[in-house]
């Protein structure tokens, strides 16, 4: 699989690339995208890791094309190309198709999986302040502690790991099959990217769609994804959690985000951290994935509801049905 240290490294570098492209104006952090976890696992089984990395580089093509179209035709081109009646079921399908991987990982230990899942749900619904912004992290922590206390959690890798160690870079072997396999998965993160930019507009009181422009934010995200794939990291995406933290703390200075990016790069060379991340039980991650992929599916349903798609119309029923089944 992918090295956690490399994921930290590419998140940090990717964020700095994004800020360079957007002229340092947009307070957004790019982190590893959970939406790609299951496709990466499946693609690695089919094409091997180097081939899968070529698919992750290919993901950037979606961002580049969208960036060019927005620059050429304006923001409304997204609505014309991806009307809600199409994009909604596509997002639903992505979420449901990924859920199987979460189940397979969770069934290794249903107790840990359900404990992690329930913790994340409870924190998301009941917690307040900064804690409410990190339900996934809380779920993983509780699941990890339970595995350490009640199960035979192997920590030998953490003990043996060096304090300082470079990320394990892997380079892609280009092939069309994994590229075509991965590209459809990029649709949901692209839509999420656009939504996050509008949310950041609301939080900061500025219009980043106009300055530096949505085409620049899409281009920056695409270049960051491309870099990640070239060195062995997962695709990156905008982190809504960071936007939520900005809303709560009122800290919206992009310089703070760049400091966080540099911190991620520095953490990526701490071998103990990489080993600790690798020691997280699959069942814990599986429980979290059930929530994440279910959330993706719900986002698709929300897309249909929020745009008032009338499913009593035969045309809409046919479009949604074919998208979900073909």
Where are these regions (language model features)?
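N-terminal signal-anchor module of multipass membrane proteins
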Residues: 1-27, 35-46
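Membrane-embedded helical hairpins/re-entrant loop segments and their flanking transmembrane helices
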Residues: 1-19, 184-254
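Membrane-embedded alpha-helical modules
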Residues: 46-156, 261-326
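Membrane-interfacial loop-to-helix junctions in multi-pass transporters
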Residues: 4-6, 49-50, 84-87, 111, ...
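Generic transmembrane alpha-helix signature in multi-pass membrane proteins
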Residues: 1, 37-46, 100-105, 198-200, ...
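Hydrophobic, membrane-embedded alpha-helices of multi-pass small-molecule transporters
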Residues: 112-116, 134-135, 166-197, 211-212
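Interfacial segments of multi-pass membrane proteins
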Residues: 39-47, 124, 242-257, 263-268
